[in-house]
Amino acid sequence: MTKYVYAFTEGDRDMKDLLGGKGANLAEMVKLGLPVPPGFTITTDACRAYLAAGESPETLDVEVTSHLRNVEQEMGKRLGDKNDPLLVSVRSGAKFSMPGMMETVLNIGLNDESVQGLAAQSGNERFAWDSYRRLIQMFGKTVQDIDGDRFADILHKLQADKGYKGDLDMTTADLKHLVEEFKKVVEEETGEAFPQDPRRQMDLAIEAVFRSWNTERAHIYRR
């Protein structure tokens, strides 16, 4: 059976064809004893299989679940936990560097409940709500193919109406308002509410990163 997922503790810098440059270098860093947060790499084989079939390989879900559980155990947190949520990022990594060409989604694991837990654990309510609005904005644009201007226009209007110079001027109340407005955009554009299931967020983000290999800008960069 093809192995599609490797923990950061597996592999080394010579496995760039399989793990991509980022994944191989993270594995090498762990091998050298450098401090690396727990995580895992989905192989380029999985990406190729997805692009060929239009869906993820049958066994990928099981492997991702197993590796996610290991990360949760190491971190002492659970993805989507309403009291102390684990947040993850889904990042791209071809075997050669393609800066800015493929997609990244941050703050996966936040939803209407876990944002409250992040606020309590961090002691910073503003940080938690800013992280959540950024997730919805990034997820909408990257994963759901919503025009980024839909979100940017709402953000800029709020700042203009209140005379703000930039993001740092926004209050917690402003950010909560943006979350609600951004969720409305997602529902208007997709016909569905922003996904509250953190695992669904992660799975959809993984597929979006796979698809980003074939975007026009990625094709142009590889020429």
Predicted regions and their residues:
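N-terminal beta-alpha lobe that positions the nucleotide/phosphoryl donor
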Residues: 1-223
